[in-house]
């Protein structure tokens, strides 16, 4: 939420769409500018300016990793959450398909002409995933015949853990390449029980990817402690320019690159590395984490005050998501008889 001053410099309209994107932090602009104007060399170059850029890239990677409870070698810098999700879904699913000896298009059994049921790869996602995940899974289905299993959620957008257990029982787990789920839902703000999801997936020998795009900078993320296999983040959600993100990937996790080229980022994301972008990600996330720690209670109180105020003036308004286990700065409502589009147009300036 941001206060937009009017022409006289006095407080004006409120920007209430920070869940979609935030403004770029002044600290981020200040930190990244030297790497756009002065220390702009390619970090792969062996000359001194290149070495200076490489040191800055390494420092940014270490700082960014620490802010997510990860190690520097877990971090693959990308162009944002969509690319991170695509790399995770397509890269892990394809690598696991080969590792499990599954075939992208099942043949027919010679005896009866029926398609063998035990050769088709599977991927499990939740029913409410972001299009970057859902469409990547659909791509696997369209081009390689993957079975896409969608786990339902309850009225508060919590994943059905029993349904996940059932989908991983028995022979099915041997064909399941991966599980992918959100950490926090961008539409309703519900936070999923990630440690329990990891426990269930790993109990069946299946890696799990977590889309943390909406959560990073809003709640603590402990990548290594949670034992997650891969995790996506996007910088524009925590004060960096758009087009910056990262995928955290454990070294144990089978994954294949989506982009081919010079072999940067552990060979998983080729392309000249964006030093200024990496610096921006590190500064933006650390700044957001510090603000979260200092203002968490205040933010929750403001959120709850807004929820109470809306309910007073619109008693029929329905708060979506979990009323307790939700992002600290997220409030989402359904107003019976009013479409979301009509409400937004009416509130827009």
Report the location of each language-model feature.
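Pyridoxal 5′-phosphate
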Residues: 1-349
């Amino acid at each position: 939420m941001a206060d937009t001053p009017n022409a006289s410099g006095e407080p004006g309209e409120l920007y209430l769409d920070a869940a979609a994107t935030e403004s770029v932090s002044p600290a981020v602009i200040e930190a990244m500018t030297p790497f756009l104007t002065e220390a702009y060399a390619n970090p792969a170059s062996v000359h001194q300016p290149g070495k200076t850029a490489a040191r800055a890239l390494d420092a940014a990677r270490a700082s960014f990793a620490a802010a997510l409870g990860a190690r520097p070698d877990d971090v693959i810098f990308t162009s944002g959450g969509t690319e991170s999700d695509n790399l995770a879904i397509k890269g892990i699913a394809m690598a696991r398909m080969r590792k499990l000896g599954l075939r992208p298009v099942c043949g027919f059994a010679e005896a009866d002409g029926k398609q063998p049921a035990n050769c088709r790869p599977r991927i499990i996602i939740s029913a409410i995933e972001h299009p970057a995940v859902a469409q990547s899974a659909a791509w696997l289905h369209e081009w390689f015949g993957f079975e896409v299993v969608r786990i339902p959620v309850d009225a508060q957008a919590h994943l059905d853990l029993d349904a996940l257990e059932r989908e991983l029982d028995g022979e099915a787990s041997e064909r399941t390449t991966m599980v992918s789920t959100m950490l926090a839902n961008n539409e309703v703000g519900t936070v999923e029980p990630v440690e329990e999801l990891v426990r269930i997936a790993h109990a069946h020998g299946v890696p799990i990817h977590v889309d943390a795009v909406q959560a990073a900078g809003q709640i603590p993320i402990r990548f290594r402690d949670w034992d997650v296999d891969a995790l996506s983040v996007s910088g524009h959600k925590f004060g960096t320019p758009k087009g910056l993100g990262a995928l955290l990937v454990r070294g144990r996790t089978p994954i294949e690159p989506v982009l081919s080229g010079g072999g940067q980022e552990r060979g998983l994301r080729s392309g000249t590395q964006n030093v200024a972008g990496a610096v921006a990600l590190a500064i933006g996330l650390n700044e957001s984490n510090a603000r979260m720690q200092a203002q968490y209670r205040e933010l929750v109180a403001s959120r709850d005050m807004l929820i109470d105020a809306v309910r007073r003036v619109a008693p029929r308004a329905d708060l979506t998501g979990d009323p307790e286990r939700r992002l600290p700065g997220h409030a989402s409502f359904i107003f019976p008889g009013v479409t979301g589009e009509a409400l937004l147009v009416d509130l827009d300036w």
